């Protein structure tokens, strides 16, 4: 046998041995556990914690549309001093230095996966529900930890407390518009606070349809409470309803909140101004 054939035979033998050494069923793409932390936070404020119902979080595979994880963010709002008052480098953790609300899950990934992460909240206040999302590339086994994937929600939580929605207003009467103003995390807006109302635009409006009848100056009354007086003009004789709107916005209007209530109007002859008596609230009809 020539030297050439001997070499070829040796190479074939070595190749066969190496092939036999690697199991034919070996799977190099087995799923690997990949922890992921997501935090839904209020813009320029803190995490959406249990006090506002937390936030709904969904992680979805961008390519397939499959939901990889879903649940609710739980926990406390966080440490205000560390989050709002302590200077941080851009790369330093802020929300995870001390405990704050988050959503934690463990995904099983077998390849680099582009995901869409969606957060919605605050769940306790559906009338101001906000939504934010990000696309993030996750790598199998690379844990997303620390502050995690941060989703920031813009807006303010505004709620008109008085007049109550069940009380008609009388033409010619004076009244007081009172509302609470908070960040979406439930954090209190007040003068000289972490969320300084002096740097915000807060006011009320008396409205007839789309027309502003009166702009109402409001003043701080208590923690997160602002109030101002209004008067319903007698010129509205014959009108059936009137609306009060409370508007709140931060300095550059990145965060805005509005609440509006429409009230039945009673004629001047039945008003408090004319009768000297409070107008009775609307009594809901009894069920049959």
Whereabouts are the PLM-identified features?
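Short acidic/polar inter-strand loop motif in beta-rich domains
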Residues: 109-130, 249-258
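Exposed beta-strand face motif in extracellular beta-rich ectodomains
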Residues: 111-115, 238-244
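Short coil-to-beta strand junction motifs in C2/discoidin
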Residues: 49-56, 192-202
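Short amphipathic, basic-aromatic surface patches that mediate peripheral association
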Residues: 38-49, 180-195
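Short, surface-exposed loop/turn segments at beta-strand-coil junctions that are enriched for proline
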Residues: 231-238
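Bacterial N-terminal signal peptides
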Residues: 9-20
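Aromatic sugar-binding surface patches on proteins
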Residues: 78-103, 222-230
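Short, compositionally biased P/S/T/A/G/V-rich stretches that sit at domain boundaries
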Residues: 137-189, 268-288
